[in-house]
């Protein structure tokens, strides 16, 4: 019987591509449209450097002028100014020992797909944790006065009224919000109250909704002292682009480990950009070449750039 060698599978170029594809298709953040792949962001992620300026035109304002038949009356043009966001590239990796990998392969016709699914599932969870940490950072200061609805002082639980008051933070731009991310405890409470609806999609896949918002359940949502954090998002509120590590997947064998029994290690690497639109990464307290989760969650590393109504993220704090 032929033996499947891990090294013969993971060194194939299509393996890393398969892991990348699975990690996004499995993610509710991607499937809901909250995180949107952007070719321009992907081009930056594939280029050299760690931080990138994203220029944009500031909105224009002012009132129209009244026409005149006096040729000496001249209109004064207003300025059209340009500013920029700043995105940061994330360099992330992980590794697993052969014991776990070998056991997980088991029997089957497609061990490559089995390994790819395992690693992709891990990347899906890890990328969601990364995003939650970034949200913690931007709401700690940059968006704290404009995009946060806090009802913890009144000991109010998450409800329809709380969410509707939260979306009002964007005023007449609130219709741009389409999904809500919440802790499983809050999701279960809404289920008990029979407030969750299930909408069918292609392939008979059903997903939960609340007040018309698609619900994404993630226990990475902060919970502190009985205070739960939920987030309202609009489509494309987080831009995403995948880079190209020199060696995305690597297999190592240490024949002397275990007193000669040998040890196998599988390493996976990703370079990508997760950028909340309308924010600037300042790097004010970043120590290394790429931010840690703690640094992403640090208030001073983010600055608000866009007008309030253009930033399609709202934080809700409730009991």
Stretch-by-stretch model annotation:
Residues 186-188, 221-223, 272-273, 280:
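Short, catalytically relevant binding-site loops at active-site mouths
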Residues 54, 81-144, 173-181, 215, ...:
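Long, contiguous amphipathic alpha-helices that act as assembly "spine/axial" helices in icosahedral shell
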Residues 49, 210, 261-263:
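Extracytoplasmic
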Residues 140-218:
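Extended, solvent-exposed, turn-rich assembly/linker loops in the middle of proteins
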Residues 1-28, 229-237, 245-319:
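Protruding loop/beta-arch "assembly-hinge" segments enriched in small, turn-prone residues
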Residues 1-87, 239, 299-319:
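N-terminal "assembly arms/tails" that initiate or stabilize quaternary assembly
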Residues 62-65, 106, 189-192, 198-199, ...:
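Short helix/loop capping segments that flank catalytic or ligand/cofactor-binding pockets
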Residues 101-172, 290-318:
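Alpha-helical scaffold segments that mediate packing/assembly in large oligomeric complexes
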